[in-house]
Amino acid sequence: MLNEVTVLNIREYLAATENGRFGEEELKELLSEFSCSKNADVERFLKEQAIEFTKKNQSVTYLVFHSQDASLVGYFTLAIKPICVSAKKFSNTTKRKIARVSEQRENELTYTLSAYLIAQLEKNFRNGANRKITGKQLLQAAVDTILKLQYMTGGMVFFLAVSYTHLRAHETLR
């Protein structure tokens, strides 16, 4: 099913004003079609903050479209964040791998490293668009995007920010 979706970085819309095809106003109009009554915070983020966060390089939002009818089926937002991990239970091999891309705190077995964060991830529930993609497929689109970024820029860690309440809701909405 992943070949049935197209993932677009919203920077493509913002940069397109130069050739007159799209632009920020067209992007805002497109985002207004997104609906998620199950999680008002992710809907509000997309409509009110995603563009500014992208302009400020705090994060980048990607829109996911169904390839057959070009309907907006979901979105995800990626950011790079520092994380601190305790390596007390890691094998020596894993510790060596993490040490290559992180800083170890003196006299502690904790490492601080940059990681890709899937900060937002949601399906569009307007007009049944949510039935055109599963949560697993949307997550896979985000992971595939991160893997491309890792190939181009490096890095080895990514994580998903999720609340338990929202996770349970997604499990019932497959």
Summary of predicted features, one role per range:
Residues A119-I133:
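A short, internal acetyl-CoA/4′-phosphopantetheine-binding micro-motif in the GNAT/acyltransferase core
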Residues S59-G74:
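Conserved beta-hairpin
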Residues L2-E52:
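Short amphipathic alpha-helix that is part of the acyltransferase structural core
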Residues K148-A161:
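Conserved GNAT acetyl-CoA-binding A-motif
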